[in-house]
């Protein structure tokens, strides 16, 4: 409330926030373990603006912008998150199997009707440069639920740590949004055509996403050595592949990656690392919204032709550990190359 009260717009700010988190772990036997993570968050934002007074321009040309408001804004953001994992260690003590389930749900409401009458004046002469009114309206509702079920296994031996998993994700999102902004300047509607009445901004969106993702990965972390048995060169090779399929756009992705860490025997204070891989960033609801404008009204629809953003990484790095002034230091250097493609731009509301 104190931060909001320092803004240029004076008014009555009433934010309320609730956040509850919990983590529980139960191990009935040496081979079974149950873990639970929960989070509840709710944020109410109530705002009734009164006036705003802003000075801007140069020292020789100062202007004053003053607004008086009517109306209010009421927002609600509520989220629930739950995560449950059941892990079983096999008798060989090298293999474990986990069944993991999680669910995330959110409800968002942005509602406001605010009208403002404004005056723009020249500070030195009190000359009236402009007068007008505007009205902003919004009824935005969003509900989303994302559920996951994951089966994961791990196996550790003397030189290998193998991990693999299969995952199914359910996505359900419903959006119903209506926004507009009306401006009137000295008796003329803006924009003014002389014939039709248009809003300077109008948005309508009614969308529903019902999709499923299927994902999986398999990777191995291999430790080995070469050279002199007394002071060998140490290697850590990590390699794997990840796959994913999304039935919303029918896209199937395969993402291999590999990295190698080397600690040379001739100087254990040095460490080298090289890595490469093909990475994808799958879109979600925000990136799916595609807008088209017809007769002054912007409509938001979901783009089923969208594709995941893609990047090829090449990385080389070096670490050098040393002591100076009786203190430990580490010098690190890294060079990387990223080839980005299929980027998805979108607008962020500020």
Where are these regions (language model features)?
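Membrane-embedded beta-strand positions in outer-membrane beta-barrel channels/transporters
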Residues: 19-21, 79-85, 100, 146-152, ...
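Short glycine/proline-enriched turns and hinge-like loops at secondary-structure junctions
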Residues: 233, 250-253, 327-329
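Membrane-embedded beta-barrel scaffold of Gram-negative outer-membrane proteins
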Residues: 96-102, 107-112, 305-350
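Periplasmic-side early beta-strands and strand-to-turn transitions of outer-membrane beta-barrels
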Residues: 1-74, 112, 342
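Alpha-helix termini
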Residues: 224-231, 264-267, 322-326
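Outer-membrane beta-barrel translocator domains and adjoining extracellular loop/strand segments
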Residues: 3-9, 47-57, 61, 110-118, ...
């Amino acid at each position: 409330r104190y931060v909001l009260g320092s803004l240029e717009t004076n008014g009555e700010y009433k934010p309320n926030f609730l956040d509850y988190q919990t983590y529980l772990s139960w191990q009935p036997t040496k081979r079974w373990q149950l873990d639970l993570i929960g989070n509840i968050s709710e944020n109410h934002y109530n705002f009734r603006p009164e006036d705003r007074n802003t000075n801007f321009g140069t020292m020789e040309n100062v202007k004053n912008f003053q607004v008086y408001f009517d109306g209010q804004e009421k927002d609600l953001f509520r989220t629930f998150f739950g995560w449950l994992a059941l892990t079983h260690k096999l008798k060989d003590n090298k293999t474990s199997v986990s069944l993991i389930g999680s669910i995330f749900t959110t409800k968002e409401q942005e509602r406001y009707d605010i009208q403002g009458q404004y005056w723009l004046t020249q500070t030195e002469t009190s000359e009236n440069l402009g007068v007008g009114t505007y009205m902003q309206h919004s009824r935005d509702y969003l509900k989303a639920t994302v559920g996951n079920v994951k089966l994961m296994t791990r196996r550790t031996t003397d030189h290998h740590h193998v991990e693999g998993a299969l995952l199914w994700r359910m996505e359900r999102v419903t959006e119903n949004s209506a926004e507009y902004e009306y401006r009137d300047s000295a008796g003329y509607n803006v924009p003014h055509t002389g014939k039709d009445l248009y809003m300077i901004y109008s948005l309508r969106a009614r969308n529903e996403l019902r999709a499923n993702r299927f994902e999986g990965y398999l990777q191995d972390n291999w430790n080995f050595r070469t050279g002199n048995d007394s002071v060998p060169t140490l290697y850590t090779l990590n390699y794997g592949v990840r796959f994913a399929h999304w039935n919303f756009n029918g896209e199937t992705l395969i993402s291999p990656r590999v990295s190698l860490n080397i600690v040379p025997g001739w100087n254990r204070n040095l460490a080298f690392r090289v890595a490469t891989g093909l990475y994808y960033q799958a879109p979600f609801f925000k990136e799916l919204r595609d807008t088209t404008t017809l007769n002054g009204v912007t409509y938001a629809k979901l783009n089923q032709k969208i594709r995941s953003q893609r990047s090829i990484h090449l990385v080389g790095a070096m670490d050098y550990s040393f002591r100076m002034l009786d203190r430990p230091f580490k010098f690190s250097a890294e060079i990387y190359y990223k080839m980005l493609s299929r980027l998805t731009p979108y607008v962020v509301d500020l």
